[in-house]
Regions:
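Conserved GNAT-fold acetyl-CoA-binding loop/helix
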Residues: 34-55, 66
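A generic secondary-structure signal
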Residues: 55-59, 120
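Short loop/turn motifs at secondary-structure junctions and domain boundaries
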Residues: 58-64, 150
């Protein structure tokens, strides 16, 4: 029997399961130049964005991760998305990812919502380690992870190709303290 999808809350945000009506907001985010500049995926149509919605659902179904729609607690407005993927039960680790619509940047929503995600990973899933892979040039994301007490472990130089050029990724990690 499947567990009920967890709803996570803080003072200003609610993290909930994606619903079909989120499609337009996910498309808005994953087609926005300021988001996709550092994000690994982008879409050019609502129809193509359905692939991402399926990915969100498949993560949970296949127990390889869980992503939430990040929403305003006040009015339910969609702010962005965040979650865990690439879960390894054997190694008790996962990868954190997140993005916010640009109009929500600089308002503390990410700093408020991401502890809900990693605490869920540590306390409910039983993870020992949560990793974040960040393009070396993405200063805003690196600052956000540092504020959340993720430690920079190193840089994988020229490890991926994006737009026909090699990019480097910084590896950040947070390890559960027991």
């Amino acid at each position: 029997m499947r567990r009920k999808f967890p709803i996570l809350e803080s003072e200003r945000v609610v993290l909930r399961q994606f619903v079909d009506s989120d499609l337009e907001n996910v498309f808005k985010g994953l087609s926005h130049p300021d988001i996709i500049h550092y994000y690994g995926i982008s879409f050019d149509s609502l129809d193509a964005t359905k692939e991402q919605m399926k990915w969100f659902a498949d993560l949970e179904k296949n127990e390889t991760g869980i992503w939430w729609a990040v929403c305003s607690k006040d009015d339910g407005r969609f702010l962005g998305a965040g979650g865990l993927n690439n879960l390894s039960k054997e190694n008790k680790k996962g990868e954190i990812g997140f993005w916010l619509l640009p109009e929500n940047w600089g308002k503390g929503f990410m700093t408020e919502s991401m502890p809900l995600v990693f605490n869920y990973g540590f306390n409910s899933i039983g993870l020992h380690r949560i990793e974040g892979f960040v393009e070396t040039e993405n200063e805003n994301c690196k600052k956000a992870l540092a504020r959340l007490k993720f430690n920079l472990e190193g840089t994988m130089r020229d490890c991926e190709i994006k737009n026909n050029a090699f990019i480097s990724l910084d590896i950040y990690a947070k390890i559960v303290v027991k």
